[in-house]
Design a protein with these regions (language model features):
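Hydrophobic ligand-binding cavity/cleft-lining segments
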Residues: 39-139, 143
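A generic structural signal for short beta-strands and their flanking turns/coil linkers
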Residues: 118-122, 136-140, 149-153, 175-181, ...
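Charge-rich (especially acidic), low-complexity segments
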Residues: 50-52, 57, 263-295
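N-terminal chloroplast transit peptides
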Residues: 1-52
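Short, ordered beta-strand-loop transition motifs
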Residues: 113-120, 146-150, 199-207
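Short beta-strand segments that buttress and anchor functional surface loops
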Residues: 124-129, 157-159, 167-168
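A conserved amphipathic terminal alpha-helix motif
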Residues: 231-280
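Beta-strand/loop substructures that line and gate deep hydrophobic ligand-binding cavities in soluble
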Residues: 166-239
Length: 295
């Protein structure tokens, strides 16, 4: 698989931090998203690559429903861009050909934590980490969309389940995740090559390409009434944790992606996973201050 990266949607912008800013009662007493909240919601749906109309509609409805639920709403997000260069040999298969492979021919890249569900859908299991004193182990379901022009692919998380204590598992429906990993590539001009890369081209021919990944992850959380932390404190800790996860996973993903290309370009069609540990994360803890939980 070329890219992996509560339930899910597309990439995001920041959202209001409390339910009071997002929703208000309509004339019959139902909660609805305010104009300001709707504007922010639409901004959150503008992914790195525009989603299909079906994806956009489904995402909008899912998020709007979630944001209309009662409770204290917290939002935190992370974005990470990363790139790796790879040598495209004269006699080898090209990067464009690699990026044009159908999802059914993807390597999972990580045989330990990625499982193929069907032709374009994969299950991803992240390592366990601590969040606000609870041990969490997220399991994601992601769908891959390969662009027809060979420019890359897009991976969207469609669903998430949490395992851990009974309290953690019962809270799975209090999360909504909006996540997209956009994988692209570009040519590297000769004058932009490093000395080492230029020496490779001089001796072996070929050219260098750059594979790029831009990942955006946003998490929406309804903070339980019994939770002893404020929305602001929850969001601060959430940003800290999500940034650590994204900053570790994306570079490892690209490293394994380029290694998979090297094997495939030389004629290896086994599509076996190239390694493990891609989703193993060392997440430190940030102190979360206990305050009046009504705030």
């Amino acid at each position: 698989m070329r890219a992996m990266s509560g339930r899910a949607s597309s990439s995001t912008s920041s959202m209001p931090t409390t339910a009071a800013r997002r929703v208000k009662r309509d004339s019959v007493g139902r909660r609805r998203v305010t104009d300001r909240g709707r504007c922010r919601l639409l901004k959150s749906l503008a992914s790195i690559e525009n989603p299909t109309r079906e994806e956009s509609t489904a995402t909008s409805e899912r998020l709007e429903t979630f944001l209309s639920r009662k409770g204290r709403h917290a939002t935190f997000e992370a974005t990470r861009k990363s790139a790796r260069r790879v040598h495209q040999r004269v006699a080898g298969r090209t990067v464009r050909e690699y990026m044009s492979l159908p999802a059914s021919q993807y390597s999972t890249l990580d045989g330990e934590s990625v499982e193929r569900v069907d032709e374009d859908t994969f299950k991803v299991e992240l390592s366990e980490f601590n969040f606000l004193g609870f041990r969490l182990k997220p399991r994601l379901r992601a769908r891959v969309h390969v662009r027809d022009d060979g420019s890359g692919c897009e991976v969207r998380v469609e669903d998430m389940e949490l395992s851990g204590s009974g309290v953690v598992e019962s809270a799975s429906d209090s999360f909504e995740i909006v996540s997209v990993n956009n994988v692209t590539w570009r040519d590297i001009e000769l004058e932009a090559l490093t000395e080492v890369e230029r020496a490779v081209v001089d001796s072996e021919g070929g050219e260098f390409k750059e594979m790029m990944s831009e990942t955006r992850v946003s998490v929406y959380l309804i903070v339980p009434g019994w939770f002893p932390f404020t929305v602001k404190s929850t969001e601060r800790t959430g940003r800290f944790v999500v940034n650590q996860v994204v900053n570790q996973v994306v570079p490892k993903f690209l490293t394994q992606l380029t290694e998979d290309y090297r094997r495939w370009s030389s004629g290896d069609d086994s599509r076996a996973a190239t390694g493990g540990g891609m989703f193993d994360c060392e997440v430190g803890e940030e102190e979360c201050v206990v305050q009046d939980s009504t705030k």
